[in-house]
């Protein structure tokens, strides 16, 4: 049973005799007979990204702090079928349409 379940429930008392009435637990709230009401949590749970950033390993060693990103060799040139091309024709409209298709503006 969680702590919020214990404090969020009302306390049942038996008021059969005047002797028991003096030992009743005073009710809190606006007189509606509610027990203690939990309004908000003082330590809310972090969302997943905030938790990941908070709990990830920290760089504490000088060699790790000063470490640079890995330098990779440059990629080879693209094959001919992946290269952009232009149409060499007298019709300016067809060349413009082909240029739009290659650039992805269409």
From Swiss-Prot:
Signal peptide: none annotated. The keyword Ribonucleoprotein applies. Its main location: plastid. GO terms for cellular component: chloroplast; plastid; ribonucleoprotein complex; ribosome. It comes from the Eukaryota. Residues 44-59 have a biased composition (Basic residues). InterPro entries: Ribosomal_cL38. Residues 42-70 are annotated as: Disordered. It holds the Pfam family DUF5323. GO terms for molecular function: mRNA binding; rRNA binding; structural constituent of ribosome. Keywords: Chloroplast, Plastid, Ribonucleoprotein, Ribosomal protein, Transit peptide. GO terms for biological process: translation. Residues 1-39 form a transit peptide. It is found in: Plastid, Chloroplast. Part of the 50S ribosomal subunit. Belongs to the chloroplast-specific ribosomal protein cL38 family. This is Large ribosomal subunit protein cL38. It comes from Arabidopsis thaliana.
């Amino acid at each position: 049973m969680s702590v919020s379940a214990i404090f969020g429930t009302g306390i049942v008392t038996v008021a059969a005799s005047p002797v028991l009435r003096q030992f009743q637990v005073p009710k809190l709230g606006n007189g509606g007979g509610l027990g203690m009401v939990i309004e908000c949590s003082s330590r809310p749970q972090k969302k997943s990204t905030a938790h990941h950033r908070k709990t990830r390993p920290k760089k504490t060693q000088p060699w790790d702090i000063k470490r640079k990103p890995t330098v990779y060799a440059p990629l080879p040139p693209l094959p001919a079928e992946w290269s952009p091309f232009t149409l060499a024709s007298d019709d300016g409209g067809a060349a413009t349409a082909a240029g739009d298709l290659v650039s992805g503006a269409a």
